[in-house]
Amino acid sequence: MINIIVELSKYLMIALMLVYTFECFAVFNYTDEYTQRSIFRKQNVLMFLLHMIAFLVMYLQTNETKMIGFYGMQVVLFLAVILLYTIIYPRVSRLVVNNMCMLMAIGFIMITRLSYSLAVKQFIIVSASVAISLVIPVIIRKVKALSEWKIFYAIAGVVMLGVVIIVGRVTGGAMLNVAIGGFTLQPSELVKIIFVFFVAASLKTDTSFKNIVITTAVAAMHVLILVVSKDLGAALIIFAVYLVMLYVASRQPLYVLVGLIAGSGASVVAYKLFNHVRVRVLVWKNPFTVYNEGGYQVAQSLMAIGTGSWFGMGLFQGAADQIPVAESDFIFSAIAEEMGLIFALGLILVCVSVYMMFLNIAMQLRDSFYKLVALGLGTCYIFQTFLTIGGVTKFIPSTGVTLPLVSYGGTSVLSTIIMFAIIQGLYVLREDEEEDIERKKLQRRRTSRSGSAAGEPARRERISRPKEEGRREKPQQTNGWRTKEKGRTQPPKKRTAASERNTGRKKRSQ
């Protein structure tokens, strides 16, 4: 009986995911608030149903009551996120909130299936991150000096990355983490956000060649430190983000071309200098030939995706726990194996809809600084998603980055939730800009109406005065004579031939 429920559940979850994904893009076709709110409510129902079915299956498979309690805690968290954001900020983007909750729900499902203890840690991290993120939209909306701190952003980014080289710990062959008071922090995740603010502040108004050279030098310093730390994923993300933001700010394709050429040259140099780069390229070419020398992860990932096929094996029916670091870097492979490739494709489309919403907000912002920030964060998010999925599917060499909001990882989850909160703040800021525009239009209309209403009596008076004066002066200007009986002007009589003869006779007789 349990096997039947598990088998049916995977098809039901795929159907729910497809409908949810369809609604993510359908909402862009509507502009009226009533229809959009209806779609958002439907998305919430679909998300909670998918989440409930998955935890029901895991409870039946494990027969552990802690699954039920953990499920209830997650439901409370999702309700709190949806309600708090919509109550505190009534004008936030509901699509961004819904997609954030959906991605976190999928992450909780798969991490719980792989390791219950890690899932509990992830839940604590997400809860704390959400609490922190609630104040960020207020900061974005109220603090107007964010665009003036470019020197601070540059120094903070370089210092945070430099600290990792000095006191950092090696994780997975790369120097990524710093231990602070019993907690592990990955500075590169936070530096990505700081770097976006630095580039936006630097290029918001000044796109001169001199300023671009200075900004490029600071960006290159970030990338170089990350390459030395062997954090290739973060280095590629910062490189891609800078190229996109530079092109949008300057509108010069030549800069992008030069950047791509320089990046290609740097890649060749890195391949010659660093052994870990050569190993990853070799694994990318054919992971099965170097299975015992570094290709084990990618090979297991490809086999897991192939085993799951279109509809998946079902939760706890596959061997997802055999994939190395399946809860973080290779979580997409675990999802594809047990929940199916169709479900995994739906997950990709949800990430794409998040990126589209980021771009939509960026295009509607009028301030160049905020526009560049939204564009940079969107590029950071979608490029990290591309690196993660491309690496586990052997589309590109593996870079060791996590899938945002889905993979396990403390600093990664914190930085992504902060990123979403910044976007929400920019969305509210965009609504404020639209309100200001409408208010100014209304004021201009009222001013023009009051001005025309005040000028109308004066205009009528100016028009009527000459007419009245003309009427009074007409009797004085007439060439006729006034009769005593009627007191009105008579025109002079016409002179006829008979009257001329009588006049002549009178003159001769005189």
Residue ranges and their predicted role:
Residues F22-F40:
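Membrane-interface helix-loop junction between the first two transmembrane segments
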Residues I305-I342, A362-L365, F369:
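Long extracytoplasmic/lumenal interhelical loops at the membrane interface
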Residues N63-G294, S333-G391, I418, I422, ...:
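Hydrophobic alpha-helical transmembrane segments of multi-pass inner membrane proteins, especially
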Residues L18, K394-E435:
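Transmembrane alpha-helices of multi-pass inner-membrane enzymes
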